[in-house]
UniProtKB/Swiss-Prot annotation:
The keyword Ion transport applies. InterPro entries: ATP_synth_OSCP/delta_N_sf (IPR026015), ATPase_OSCP/dsu (IPR000711). This is ATP synthase subunit delta. It comes from the Bacteria. F(1)F(0) ATP synthase produces ATP from ADP in the presence of a proton or sodium gradient. F-type ATPases consist of two structural domains, F(1) containing the extramembraneous catalytic core and F(0) containing the membrane proton channel, linked together by a central stalk and a peripheral stalk. During catalysis, ATP synthesis in the catalytic domain of F(1) is coupled via a rotary mechanism of the central stalk subunits to proton translocation. This protein is part of the stalk that links CF(0) to CF(1). It either transmits conformational changes from CF(0) to CF(1) or is implicated in proton conduction. SUPFAM superfamilies: N-terminal domain of the delta subunit of the F1F0-ATP synthase. Pfam families: OSCP (PF00213). It is a peripheral membrane protein. The lineage of its organism: Bacteria, Bacillati, Bacillota, Bacilli, Lactobacillales. Its main location: membrane. Belongs to the ATPase delta chain family. GO terms for molecular function: proton-transporting ATP synthase activity, rotational mechanism.
Length: 180
């Protein structure tokens, strides 16, 4: 029975997270995994090639060596184990799941803010501070999106939460009340 990608990612990431936490190497491991993610994202065919059984083992291992060479011992073990079990296509999923665990530990929340006009840096940091206080996060990382249909106000989306303070929504609610 084959495990699905999410299950594989959760198991590997949790094991690595626990190990790095125990060995007091969580921060350096996190930084290293971010770099590894960037390598796989910049080279989208890499994981496929490392898993491609039609390539000679020597060719695949030649692709693997630069990753192992620059890795710390625990990350090197992760890469080698994932490669040995033929799960290189799960590597970014594993790193993404590790990121979730890391963010939970550090109370970091990612949110998307939608406004009618571009926000200034000061406005973004005000929204980050207010939203962090509201959800109990130590840090909020915002990405912003401009949608003129919002008319005014702000919509903040994070995970399964939407805070809609847009003028468009207020107008729609008023319209519904008047038509009721």
């Amino acid at each position: 029975m084959s495990l699905n990608r999410a299950t594989v990612a959760k198991r590997y990431s949790q094991a690595l997270f626990d190990l790095l936490s125990e060995k007091d190497q969580l921060e350096s491991g996190y930084t290293e995994l971010q770099e590894l993610r960037r390598i796989f994202q910049d080279n989208p065919q890499l994981s496929t090639m490392l898993s491609d059984a039609s390539l000679q083992v020597a060719d695949r291992e030649a692709l693997l060596q630069p990753l192992l060479k620059q890795a710390s011992p625990y990350i090197k073990n992760l890469i080698q184990m994932v490669y040995d079990y033929g799960r290189m296509e799960n590597m970014v999923d594993i790193i993404d799941q590790f990121q979730v665990l890391y963010d939970e530990l550090h109370h970091t929340v990612y949110a998307e803010v939608t406004t009618a006009v571009e926000l200034s840096a000061e406005q973004k940091s005000q929204i980050e501070a207010v939203y962090a206080k509201r959800v109990g996060a130590e840090k909020v990382v915002l990405s912003s999106k401009v949608d003129p249909d919002v008319i005014g106000g702000v919509i903040v989306k994070a995970a399964d939460t939407i805070l809609d303070g847009s003028l468009r929504t207020k107008i729609n609610r008023l319209r519904q009340q008047l038509l009721a």
